[in-house]
Amino acid sequence: MSDNDTIVAQATPPGRGGVGILRISGFKAREVAETVLGKLPKPRYADYLPFKDADGSVLDQGIALWFPGPNSFTGEDVLELQGHGGPVILDLLLKRILTIPGLRIARPGEFSERAFLNDKLDLAQAEAIADLIDASSEQAARSALNSLQGAFSARVNHLVEALTHLRIYVEAAIDFPDEEIDFLSDGKIEAQLNDVIADLDAVRAEARQGSLLREGMKVVIAGRPNAGKSSLLNALAGREAAIVTDIAGTTRDVLREHIHIDGMPLHIIDTAGLREASDEVERIGIERAWQEIEQADRVLFMVDGTTTDAVDPAEIWPEFIARLPAKLPITVVRNKADITGETLGMSEVNGHALIRLSARTGEGVEVLRNHLKQSMGFDTNMEGGFLARRRHLQALEQAAEHLQQGKAQLLGAWAGELLAEELRLAQQNLSEITGEFTSDDLLGRIFSSFCIGK
């Protein structure tokens, strides 16, 4: 297998459909056109033609599109055949194309990978293709499209350019120490560095928003049996996702629901009631509950308000709180306010949010929705955003750390060499986002997660 091979893959989803598309990219795409179509179509024009088998019989008829390189998606010669979407027809056409020497099936994401390697896309834009396909909400789709069109990359490139100018200034001060003006201490470098830090902080805030749109928030509902966990899952989901009875231990396995709150994906997980297991099935369910809790972004600690007046989680169930991961955020949810007569709404107890509601009637659930959105820093009014992945957040975080360390070197010791090195490392972190400095291993992992025909 060679990266110089001509590749072919189905670009439409498997299964039956009105239209099925095969995409070919590489130097032999021209030969495929001449062999299967009998001619080379006019570049970038839709040509209605028969698709022929090796014996000259017609396999299908449809639209052929010819994009000679470098003016194509991949930067190579690209041919697209748009025929009928029957699996048998597409399979026959694919087999016919693969009889031509030098053709092979594309690896997952190989078309996008070739576009990146041929400078048609940077890495952030290439990732945005997969994110656009996987978008689970309108807001996520719009943000992914912004990333594909270069919004995220432009912000990163602006930061890289600013760091380049700052590095030139710092290194000039190092190389010419005998000048009358002390460039390191005249305040200009500090002012420029502060501007870059402020711009980076703004990009980080927007990237966190973009990461929420892509990844969502994992919320686990946990508590004792019969506290109303499944009722709360149903209330948040807006449908009967879980069976609800008065029998303690009804939920024995993990139940998952995927919803959106004003565009923010929310993965809600209902777990088995936590207690001493009465049988092997319940024991396994409780073990799985703890596994989900340990991986959560937030835990909703469900409390049956009819069983206790306590509001402090450490007082309600100290053993449960002691077992939770140290930095895991907790929201205490006192349920059954319709029975206890408690005032609905949110307050705070010992640093934890406390919400009183009725999962059965739905009263107070909207307060919980808003709390979940706000606790993750999700801003529904942020327009023109972009999607971001965890690797992007890590790169931005590392760049910010290097800039702060560089600032400390500047203000503490006027150490120009150390400042210059921190600026270089920050610049390298940012360049990893767009793929200017990226390992082959990372590229392999990124593109292997794509669809075959992308």
From Swiss-Prot:
Its main location: cytoplasm. Its cofactor is K(+). Coiled coil: none annotated. PROSITE patterns: G_TRME (PS51709). Residues 216-377 form the TrmE-type G domain. Mg(2+) binds at residues 230, 251. Binds 1 potassium ion per subunit. (6S)-5-formyl-5,6,7,8-tetrahydrofolate binds at residues 23, 80, 120, 454. K(+) binds at residues 226, 245, 247, 250. Its EC number is 3.6.-.-. It holds the Pfam family MMR_HSR1. GO terms for biological process: tRNA methylation; tRNA wobble uridine modification. GO terms for molecular function: GTP binding; GTPase activity; metal ion binding. One of its GO terms (cellular component) is cytosol. GTP binds at residues 226-231, 245-251, 270-273, 335-338, 358-360. Gene3D superfamilies: P-loop containing nucleotide triphosphate hydrolases, Probable tRNA modification gtpase trme, domain 1, tRNA modification GTPase MnmE domain 2. It is an enzyme of class 3 (hydrolase). Exhibits a very high intrinsic GTPase hydrolysis rate. Involved in the addition of a carboxymethylaminomethyl (cmnm) group at the wobble position (U34) of certain tRNAs, forming tRNA-cmnm(5)s(2)U34. PANTHER family: TRNA MODIFICATION GTPASE GTPBP3, TRNA MODIFICATION GTPASE GTPBP3, MITOCHONDRIAL. Homodimer. Heterotetramer of two MnmE and two MnmG subunits. Belongs to the TRAFAC class TrmE-Era-EngA-EngB-Septin-like GTPase superfamily. TrmE GTPase family. This is tRNA modification GTPase MnmE. It comes from Escherichia coli (strain 55989 / EAEC). The gene is mnmE.
